[in-house]
Amino acid sequence: MKKLIFLIVIALVLSACNSNSSHAKELNDLEKKYNAHIGVYALDTKSGKEVKFNSDKRFAYASTSKAINSAILLEQVPYNKLNKKVHINKDDIVAYSPILEKYVGKDITLKALIEASMTYSDNTANNKIIKEIGGIKKVKQRLKELGDKVTNPVRYEIELNYYSPKSKKDTSTPAAFGKTLNKLIANGKLSKENKKFLLDLMLNNKSGDTLIKDGVPKDYKVADKSGQAITYASRNDVAFVYPKGQSEPIVLVIFTNKDNKSDKPNDKLISETAKSVMKEF
């Protein structure tokens, strides 16, 4: 009996190793194909299975942080209080604010701020959300409370999008970011109403159609938030992926970049990475 158990354990270990080496080889090949760097962290919240690739390497998180900021604000504000209004001044407006630029001199609700940030990736909306939380220091404090001492918010929009590989400013690792997303949104303190509100925004978001959504089976549901920094071809997507018939998501973080500051990203890199990683689940 002991020998049988030993053989079963060995078989499981070898199977896991083969699985890991399989996706690692495919992702290494993708890095060569696109002359890029890939970082991946995936967590099946149902089984606890993880898939990692360069998961402790730092990348610019760019606009994917809007999901975290929105979730932190939604922890603080009950759903029936999201009608609170904030005033928008001309000086508040930064580049790429397609919704908030229409509100100069007017008031906007917290609910509409989150909708603008998550659905249109409105940069001014993200800044206002951070300020409603209490500023960048409060965001960092909440991250530390969640056990995340890696994700490093320093700047507001749009400066946070100027990534430098020599700096840790506004960067994270796929593993740290993915675990924080899980603790904040999938298994966090959000009320039922606020969680549904945020995930519905991510599910109906169209900006990620060429990213993780493009790499998973069409009958999967994908609630995502994409991001793209201005430098080093930094292109990201973070998502809660729901396989058909599964109510507990797979948290999937894909961060990518390149070596040259002026390089341009390719969305196919992320969709092909997602396709490779999801074979493991």
Curated annotation (Swiss-Prot):
Protein name in UniProt: Beta-lactamase
EC primary class: hydrolase
Any Pfam family: Beta-lactamase2
Catalytic activity: a beta-lactam + H2O = a substituted beta-amino acid
Family: Belongs to the class-A beta-lactamase family.
UniProt: substrate binding residues: K225, S226, G227
Active site positions: S63 (acyl-ester intermediate)
Protein keywords: Antibiotic resistance, Hydrolase, Plasmid, Signal, Transposable element
Other facts noted in the record for this chain: The class A beta-lactamase family has a specific amino-acid numbering system, sometimes called Ambler or ABL numbering and often misspelt as Amber. A multiple sequence alignment was used to derive a consensus sequence and then the consensus was numbered taking into account insertions and deletions. This allows use of identical numbers, e.g. for active site residues, despite differences in protein length. UniProt always uses natural numbering of residues, hence there appear to be differences in numbering between this entry and some papers.
GO molecular function, one term: beta-lactamase activity
InterPro entries found in the cross-reference section: Beta-lactam/transpept-like, Beta-lactam_cat, Beta-lactam_class-A, Beta-lactam_class-A_AS, Membr_lipoprot_lipid_attach_CS
The EC number(s) this enzyme carries: 3.5.2.6
GO biological process, one term: response to antibiotic
Gene3D superfamilies: DD-peptidase/beta-lactamase superfamily
Provenance organism: Staphylococcus aureus
Residues in the signal sequence: 1-24
